[in-house]
From Swiss-Prot:
Belongs to the AllG family. InterPro entries: AllG-like (IPR009499), OXTCase_su_AllG_h-dom (IPR024033). Gene3D superfamilies: conserved protein of unknown function from Enterococcus faecalis V583, Enterococcus faecalis V583 domain, NAD(P)-binding Rossmann-like Domain, v583 domain like. This is Uncharacterized protein YahG. Pfam families: AllG. It comes from Escherichia coli (strain K12). It comes from the Bacteria.
Length: 472
């Protein structure tokens, strides 16, 4: 038997350490490398914690809590109800408050892109006359820095949000909670990517003085826009609604247009708004973020639940929040995003993973729904087959599917919903996120896009924190 085995061509499946497959390849043996990691990534403390959770007397309560979290995500019905300045609507906003993406961070520890966005926002708000003065003010202790997520908000990339910026107002019709996010500056050299020169400030001024009031008054006429229905339509039209938004932006401006033309503004001002929207498909990107935030907040704070309700990054740390552990962040080091760079830039120019936009993946779209948007690989890299596989694979770490938001290419499977920290811990499969890449230095902006995963440390800490909280 052994003689016949080794006298014929071999096709070896290698599980685990890649060095074995590398050695076989050098000997011209066909090898399939199976990407596998042991439960808890081999950390026996985490393995024991996972076993304790699975065998806990609380098992029935955990299952019921997780089912409730999944149902709240699925049953959430977010609608856009208006636009207004942050100072008027965002809980806790003051003239000297700056909200930012990701878990809490101090000025001293912020990455270049976030510092660039903060100084630009302080100049925009008239709190500093130039960027140097803004940096001094930011370091003085006079400015309150706080995560967007702790103010019912989300913020794209650096996520910097200040008092006079106009915000989406999204209401969860099912549960009544409201979520906010600022408006898209469109793409490349923009504040949220760390750019802060006069052209950036001028654009922010126009958004505050022209676009914001027009959209605010348009929504007073329209009343509400059904975002869950629009999201489902956009996915069926080839978006994944994180980094590809061609369909979503078309649908959103289509819904806003009747209100815009009835709101009483000049034809010239209306033209400026329409041209601005047409300049990039990203106009609806923040809209989906606020929609997802409204749904995920409804699932937060359910006792015993192991469902992830927040994934967010500040360019230094990646942070998770878990439904059954309200008020806590579980952090690990932000990772490098892997993907195509714009001409003239190289990977070492890039900052680390940043932004609250991973709320889209937390809900089940973006990287989780890449099978709806095969064309996204032109932006973030990889192959169409890999994009489709990501959507299948994410089902292994989630509790169910959302029948309201489906993937045609996978037989209209609902998007994978409700990431479970225990499933991530047991399988070693990490959530997939597609995202933009900001330059590591302030003042530059977007330089690429790609794929990234959270560090396992976030899930490790969350699993151990859950066990500590519930005495398991």
């Amino acid at each position: 038997m052994s003689q016949s085995l080794f006298s014929q061509p071999l096709n070896v499946i290698n599980v685990g350490i890649a060095m074995f497959s590398d050695d076989l390849k050098k000997q011209h043996v066909e090898v399939t490398q199976l990407d596998w990691t042991p439960p808890g990534q081999g950390n026996m403390q985490v393995v024991q914690a996972l076993d304790n959770i699975a065998d806990s007397p609380l098992a029935d309560k955990i299952a019921a809590a997780n089912q409730q979290a999944l149902e709240r995500i699925i049953q959430s019905h977010p609608v856009l109800i208006g636009f207004d300045q942050a100072i008027n609507v965002v809980p806790g906003m003051t003239a000297k408050t700056i909200l930012h993406a990701g878990p809490p961070i101090t000025w001293e520890k912020m990455c270049g892109a976030m510092k660039g966005a903060v100084t630009g926002a302080l100049v925009f708000e008239g709190l500093a006359k130039d960027l140097d003065e803004a940096a001094e003010l930011a370091a003085s202790g006079e400015i309150t820095f706080s995560p967007c997520h702790e103010h019912d908000c989300v913020g794209s990339m650096a996520g910097v949000t200040s008092a006079s910026m106009f915000m989406h107002i999204v209401k969860n019709k099912t549960y009544g909670n409201i979520a906010y996010t600022n408006m898209s500056e469109q793409m490349a050299k923009i504040l949220r990517m760390g750019a802060n020169d006069q052209s950036v400030i001028d654009r922010l001024n126009w958004m505050r003085d022209v676009q914001g009031p027009i959209l605010r008054d348009a929504m007073k006429i329209i009343g509400e826009i059904d975002l869950r229905l629009m999201l489902a339509q956009a996915l069926h039209m080839g978006d994944e609604c994180h980094n590809r938004n061609n369909a979503g932006t078309t649908l959103l401006i289509q819904a806003l247009t009747p209100g815009i033309i009835q709101a009483g503004y000049s034809v010239e001002q209306q033209r400026e708004v329409f041209e601005f929207v047409a300049s990039s498909d990203y106009f609806s990107g923040p809209t989906w973020m606020a929609m997802c935030k409204a749904a995920m907040d409804a699932a937060h704070g359910i006792e015993y639940s192991t469902v992830v309700t927040t994934m967010a990054r500040n360019g230094v740390e990646f942070g998770l929040r878990v439904s059954g552990l309200p008020g806590q962040w579980f952090t690990g080091p932000a990772q490098q995003v892997i993907g195509p760079m714009f001409a003239g830039y190289k990977p070492e120019d890039s900052g680390l993973d940043i932004g609250d936009s991973a709320i889209t993946e937390t809900y089940g779209i973006g990287g989780f729904a890449m099978a709806t948007a095969p064309a996204i690989v032109a932006l973030v890299g990889g192959t169409v087959e890999e994009a489709i596989d990501f959507s299948r694979q994410m089902r292994e770490i989630t509790l169910g599917e959302n029948p309201n938001v489906t993937i045609p290419l996978l037989g209209f499977m609902g998007v994978p919903s409700a990431i479970d920290i225990t499933r991530v811990g047991s399988s070693g499969i990490l959530p997939v996120i597609n995202t933009a890449i900001a330059h590591k230095d302030a003042g530059v902006g977007m330089i690429g896009a790609g794929i990234v995963h959270p560090p396992f440390a976030c899930f490790e800490k969350a699993i151990l924190g859950w066990c500590e909280r519930y005495g398991v």
